[in-house]
Design a protein with these regions (language model features):
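AMP-binding/adenylate-forming catalytic core of the ANL superfamily
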Residues: 26, 31-32, 39-42, 54-144, ...
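Short, acidic, Ser/Thr-enriched surface-loop or helix-capping motifs
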Residues: 15, 58, 106, 157-158
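Short proline/glycine- and acidic-rich turn/helix-capping motifs at secondary-structure junctions
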Residues: 149-159
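Short, small-residue-biased leader/transition segments that mark boundaries at the very start
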Residues: 1-9
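Ser/Thr-glycine-rich phosphate-binding loops at phosphate-binding pockets of nucleotides
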Residues: 9, 51, 75, 158-160
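AMP-binding/adenylate-forming core of the ANL superfamily
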Residues: 14-29, 48, 54-55
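Short loop/turn microsegments at loop-to-beta-strand junctions
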Residues: 18, 46, 51-52, 96, ...
Length: 187
């Protein structure tokens, strides 16, 4: 970001992940949450604004987006970014779309579950599911790859095209769906 001092906390060497932090004070920075000063104050640590985005810095000093901190899946001692898993799944020739969540599991904390929309001409059957699971394990490793895959006709997205992972998770766990005003196709 031109003119804005950035860092990723607590990164000290290249290719480590951390939360993207910005020095406040640029003209377009938001000034607070309406009627929630405590929430706004929690966004700052040591003079840095914590964005909630995870990033890694490469050897040239460039930052690469990893995912949202609140989307991170904690599974068997690993921190898994859903974007990483979704991107790998999208490389499979049968996969048109993918959305990934963490599903509570008493043994490993959360298991990685993927919701997949298939490309035309591919069957939503056990063989396809096993093929995609195997593909993901080879790309990501057994600890990061999904343990479950569910085929869907569509993945819920916001009007701006972002996957609504919180909605996938709420529906999976039978929880209230919350605010759907940004859901693509809602009126």
């Amino acid at each position: 970001m031109t003119g804005v001092q950035t860092c990723a906390l607590p990164i000290s060497r290249p290719d480590e992940e951390g939360e993207l932090a910005l020095r406040p004070g640029w003209p377009s920075m938001f000034r607070g949450y309406l009627h929630e000063p405590e929430r706004y104050a929690k966004c700052f640590v040591g003079g840095w604004y914590l964005t909630g985005d995870l990033a890694r810095r490469d050897a040239d000093g460039y930052f690469w987006f990893v995912g949202r901190a609140d989307d991170i899946i904690k599974t068997a001692g690993h921190m898994v970014g859903p974007f990483e898993v979704e991107s790998a799944l999208m490389e499979h020739p049968a996969v048109a779309e993918a959305g990934v969540i963490g599903k509570p599991d008493p043994t490993i904390g959360e298991l990685v579950k993927a919701f997949v929309v298939l490309k035309p001409g591919h069957a939503a059957d056990e063989q396809t599911r096993l093929d995609i699971l195997g593909f993901a394990r080879k790309r990501l490793g057994a600890a990061v790859a999904p343990k479950e895959i569910e085929f869907k006709d569509q993945i819920p997205r916001t009007r701006s095209g972002k996957i609504m992972r919180r909605l996938l998770k709420a529906r999976e766990l039978g929880l209230p769906e919350g605010d759907l005003s940004t859901l693509e196709g809602s009126s």
